[in-house]
Amino acid sequence: MRCHLKKWVVVAAGLSILTSLYVYMQRAQSGNLKGSVIWTWDRESWMEGIKSHYLHFNISINVLGGVLQPSKKYLTVGLSSVRREKGFYLHDTLQSIFSESSEEELDQMVVVVLLADFDLPWIQQTADKISREFAVQLSKGRLLVIHANKEHYPPLTGLKRNFNDAPDRVSFRSKQNVDYSFLLHFSSNLSQYYIMLEDDVGCSRNFLSSIQQHIRSMTDSKWVTLEFSKLGYIGKLYQSKDLPTLARFLYNFYQEMPCDFLLSHFRRLLMQDKVIRFRPSLFQHMGTYSSFRGTYNRLKDEDFVQELADNPPADVRTNIQVFQTYVPEKAYSQDVEYFWGVSPIGTESFFLVVFREAVRISRVQIHTGSDGKDELASADVELGRVLVTGEPAVDCSGFKTLGSLQHGQFNEEGVQKLLPDAVVCLRIRVTAAQPEWVIISRIQVWTVKEDKTI
């Protein structure tokens, strides 16, 4: 009982602190800093008797490149970049954002890059490089490059060593929290939504359209954070109305814990208990060396797909017994849920996707199991060319085998070369009985894109 009471007191105190944060933002032109935006954060001390030189301050954000637009966009893509001991990935990240988006998508977004290093020559050099290589995007207001002077940062040394981290790691992650705090505040009035990236990521093709689709699917739900990657704080989406509060939250608790920990606490404090993550991931970490100490880092998101699957409209069914609400449709829906089937699973078992219109297929990818468990051990993947109408459901015939699952996985590209004709269904046919249950987490289908050139 005492433990539960203690937890409740902590949560209540956290909520009290959070709800007492008040943000006032004012934009003004600085007479000393050309092209800058002054953001004034006024607040009363949220704890009686606590005084600090950084509880009340003005920060000057210098806009180094780009044109602020008079109207709001749909999405702001925000990323912070610092000088690395090894590697430089910012150019590739920006190139990926712009090249993987259509002109229509680019008109709906703005990319904000905070050059957050204290090395001013590096800042100038990097800003000049961006100006040369992305001149068109800067001129169209699709890209903004900003910087905050060191004088606006709170103390970054002599901080609390929570988690027993080394002092330099504490300083690094604490500064990173402040970097994102400044970036969030600057971006809070630029668009309807905001997504957080790092400066060493690659993007899926047409990622904005996919984000819009998922946001529409959440119309009837209240949410704080939507996630489009499983790595750290890459791909976390927020509503811009929450950005000032989130920015203040990161700033107030900048030395307590890493940014991804704080973001999780923020989500829970605003009463979203469960993580809402969509799959496949839209963003992939591509850096080889970390911005901290230049250490080797090959972290990858295995759920990332460069070109998102089409998954044309279809009806899905199986003769495998369904466990609770883990219905067959969830394997084909491209969200975080999955199909879960109960044993026994025998050679008569199948999983069938019947397309509502005949389609030409270029690629099929299937993932089964979770953490090495509940994999479909032995099955063939087949495409059917003839629709058979009957009772109790529509079926198919004229099957051609694409291949077999290997360790519960299947990935076949260039399907149109093996089967150039349109097909009406995809079947996973079990070829050996297994006592284990089965999870089919993802079925992805890419269709042949017709060449519209003459």
UniProtKB/Swiss-Prot annotation:
UniProt keyword terms in alphabetical order: Glycoprotein, Glycosyltransferase, Golgi apparatus, Membrane, Metal-binding, Signal-anchor, Transferase, Transmembrane, Transmembrane helix
Topology relative to the membrane: Single-pass type II membrane protein
Glycosylation: residue positions: 58, 189
Cofactor(s) needed by this chain: a divalent metal cation
EC id: 2.4.1.145
Places the protein is found: Golgi apparatus membrane
Molecular function via GO: acetylglucosaminyltransferase activity; alpha-1,3-mannosylglycoprotein 4-beta-N-acetylglucosaminyltransferase activity; metal ion binding
Residue ranges crossing the lipid bilayer per the database entry: 7-24
Catalytic activity: N(4)-{beta-D-GlcNAc-(1->2)-alpha-D-Man-(1->3)-[beta-D-GlcNAc-(1->2)-alpha-D-Man-(1->6)]-beta-D-Man-(1->4)-beta-D-GlcNAc-(1->4)-beta-D-GlcNAc}-L-asparaginyl-[protein] + UDP-N-acetyl-alpha-D-glucosamine = N(4)-{beta-D-GlcNAc-(1->2)-[beta-D-GlcNAc-(1->4)]-alpha-D-Man-(1->3)-[beta-D-GlcNAc-(1->2)-alpha-D-Man-(1->6)]-beta-D-Man-(1->4)-beta-D-GlcNAc-(1->4)-beta-D-GlcNAc}-L-asparaginyl-[protein] + UDP + H(+)
Cystine residue pairs: none
UniProt-listed InterPro entries: Glyco_transf_54, MGAT4_A/B/C_C
Pfam families, sorted: MGAT4_cons, MGAT4A_C
Pathway assigned in UniProt: Protein modification; protein glycosylation
Positions in the Lumenal compartment: 25-454
One cellular component term from this protein's GO annotations in UniProt: Golgi membrane
Similarity field: Belongs to the glycosyltransferase 54 family.
Protein's job: Glycosyltransferase that participates in the transfer of N-acetylglucosamine (GlcNAc) to the core mannose residues of N-linked glycans. Catalyzes the formation of the GlcNAcbeta1-4 branch on the GlcNAcbeta1-2Manalpha1-3 arm of the core structure of N-linked glycans.
Protein name (record): Alpha-1,3-mannosyl-glycoprotein 4-beta-N-acetylglucosaminyltransferase C
Gene name of the encoded protein: mgat4c
